[in-house]
Structures are given as C-alpha cells and as structure tokens.
Amino acid sequence: VEESIKKEEIQPISIEKNKFTILIAEDNESNYKLFASILKGEYQLIHAWDGQEAVEMFKQYNPQIILMDINMPVMDGYEATKEIRKYSAKVPIIAITAFAYASDEQRVMESGFDGYMPKPINARLLKAQLTEIMQKRIILL
C-alpha cells in the first residue's frame, strides 16, 4: 500500500502492522514513483513532498525508516533531518542525493544521517541498505 499526500490533503493513513513503514521525502514525482515501484509490496510507504512535510509526517506516523532527498523546497533534507533528530536519534535516515562526491557523502554522514544513497537509485543497493537497517533494528528491539 502506498500513499502520496499533497500538503493541503494530509489525511489519516492506515498503517499495516506487519510491515516496516518508510517515509519517502521526495519532491520529484518521477523519483517517488521509482522508489514506490522498487519498494511496493514489501513496505508500507508514505510520501512527503518537502522537508517540512516530512517532519510533520514523522511526528504523526512514526515511520521505522526515512528516505530523505537533500534538495527540496520549503525545507531541505539537512534541516528536516536536524528537526527530526530533536524527536528521535534512533530512526534511520538515509540521504538520497544527486551529489555524489566523497565530500558530499562526508557532509551527509556528519549531518545526522545514517546512510547515503546517490542518484540515480540502484534498486539492488537500496534494498540491501534497507535490509541491513531492518536487521539492526530487529536485533535492537
């Protein structure tokens, strides 16, 4: 089940109990659809169009994992992650970015993110990173 929510249309989302919930903060609809096609069926997906909405949806739905685009309107991924970290130091946040230099990855990791995924998205690597995060969370529970 996937839900794409426009800012003016925030509605309750039914969360499936047996699936990890992933919040995808992505302002580009094509990129979101790519994530959805890779992850649908395996995860409960919720969608934020910008960083501010991602913070609001995090507080409302408490997802287990966040995929956070870096370059978004209203509030970028760095600021959104900083805000989310005020509420939870534990939720894994993976930065999704077109910036692919080593210095970009270093900045991401120093900014409170738990992982880094350069665009274009590689489905196999994304699934592997999510599986690793989920296994760590299950061990910690």
Task: Outline where the language-model segments fall.
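Conserved acidic carboxylate
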Residues: 26
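Charged docking surfaces used in two-component/phosphorelay signaling
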Residues: 33-40
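Disordered, acidic interdomain junction associated with two-component signaling
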Residues: 1-23, 138-141
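Active-site beta3 strand of CheY-like receiver
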Residues: 61-67
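C-terminal output helix
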Residues: 3, 121-130
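Receiver (REC) domain active-site loop signature in two-component systems and cognate sites
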Residues: 72
